[in-house]
Amino acid sequence: MLITNTEEKIIKKEMEKLKNRIVLTVFTDFITNKSEKERRRTIESERVLGILNKLEELSQGKLNIKELSIKENQDKTEMYNIRNIPTIMFQSSENNNNNNKELIRYTANLEGNQLIPFLKSVLYYSGVNPFYKDQIITNLKNIKRSEITLFISQTCAYCPQVIPIVNSFAIISNGKIKVEIIDVNAHPDIAMKHKISGVPHTIINKKKHLYGLFSPQDLLDNLTMGKRDFSGMYS
C-alpha cells in the first residue's frame, strides 16, 4: 500500500496522541507458504494491512496489529462470525482471554476520506475522550443493548463526521452498543440486501433508520427512545 507523504504526516501526528496501549485484530485471507516466511493475500487485504502496519510503525509501541487468516485461523473466524475480509475488530481491553468482547467491526476501506475518522476512532479506543463522553455515560442506563450498522463510501461528504460518533458510542459503552461499519462500494451485496440508496445510512437494531448527517445528541435520542437524561455535561 502506497501512503503519501501527507498521509504519513497525518498518521504520525495522530498516533502521537495515543493514550494507552491497544491491539487491533484484522482478519485477512493470507496463506502462509511452506517455508513459513511469506504470506500471500488479496489486493484488498494488502491495502488495508499496509495502512494498519504504518499506524503500528508510527505509534511508538502503543498500537499492535494482530493479523488472523480466515483460512488458517478458522476457529477464530467461526467464533467471531467473520463474513467479509478484510475485517478490523475493536475489542474490549478489560481482559486478555480468547473471548474479548466485540465493540466495533470495521469492513471498510481506510483510504481517502475514511482515514481521518478511522484515526479518530483509534484514538478514542486508546482512551482519548470525545467531548460528549459524559452524555453517553449518563444515558447508558436508558439504553438497552443495541447494534448500529453504518453504511459509508469513500465519496461520501458526511461519512467522516458520523463514523467517529458511532464508534465512540461503542467504545464508551464497552460493547453495550455494538457497531459495524460497512463500505457500500466494497460490499455492494450487503448494501443491496439492506436497500441502501444513499450514504451515510445508519440502522439501529435492524429497524430504526437515520439518513444523512446526525449529531451525538441525535443518536442519543434514538438510542434512548426519547428518554435522554439532560443532566450530563455538554447537553
Question: Where are the model-predicted features located?
Answer:
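Thiol-based oxidoreductase modules, predominantly thioredoxin-like and allied folds used
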Residues: 60-73, 174-190
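Structural micro-motif
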Residues: 74-94, 101, 193-205
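Local sequence-structure signature of Cys/Sec-based thiol-disulfide redox active-site neighborhoods
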Residues: 14-59, 138-175
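N-terminal leader/targeting and pre-domain segments
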Residues: 1-23, 113-144, 228-235
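Positively charged, low-complexity, intrinsically disordered RNA-binding extensions
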Residues: 150, 173, 182, 197, ...
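Acidic, two-metal ion nucleic-acid-processing modules in DNA metabolism proteins
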Residues: 47-60, 67-68, 103, 110-112, ...
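N-terminal beta-loop-helix "entrance" segment that forms/cooperates
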Residues: 34-42, 76-78, 190-193
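Non-catalytic, surface beta->alpha helical segment in thiol-disulfide oxidoreductase systems
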Residues: 90-128, 203-235
